[in-house]
Amino acid sequence: MMFFSERGTPVVAPISGHVVTIGDVDEPIFSGRVIGDGVAIVPSDGKVVAPISGVVSFIGEQKHTYGIVGYDGIEVLIHLGIGTVRLEGEGFTPAVQVGAKVEVGAPICTMDLELMRAKQFDLTCPVVITSAAMDKVKRLTLLTGPALAGQTVCMRYVPVKA
């Protein structure tokens, strides 16, 4: 399902928790918007769902990053935790494969928050429109506060007209 309106296309929270600005992330590659622009979520639950409808474009080798390209060509990146690449996949259980078509709210992964807390990882999950896709975005609106996975809109974008 695709949503279009004057206010823009919604991107829902892929994980329940509290949405903060990307500038609040304690990792310069995200807070500096090097990879893209968006928000971050401090998770309260480990169930991760698709924030947009589209096709899974990649899954990081360590299972901590997921990309979904929407049917309008805009790519959203979900990065599960900060420094979690060092877990080498431990604590992440993918529910999709690259090339899978997903709808908003479809399960894409489960992350073991207790394991990550025990190993003292920062659980903050950046959710960004990738730098390459930002060239196709005319306007991006970011929304912060409490969020429910698959339900709460955390961003809206207006694509550049072709």
Regions from the PLM with identified roles:
Residues 1-162:
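Contiguous, well-folded functional domains in the mature portion of proteins
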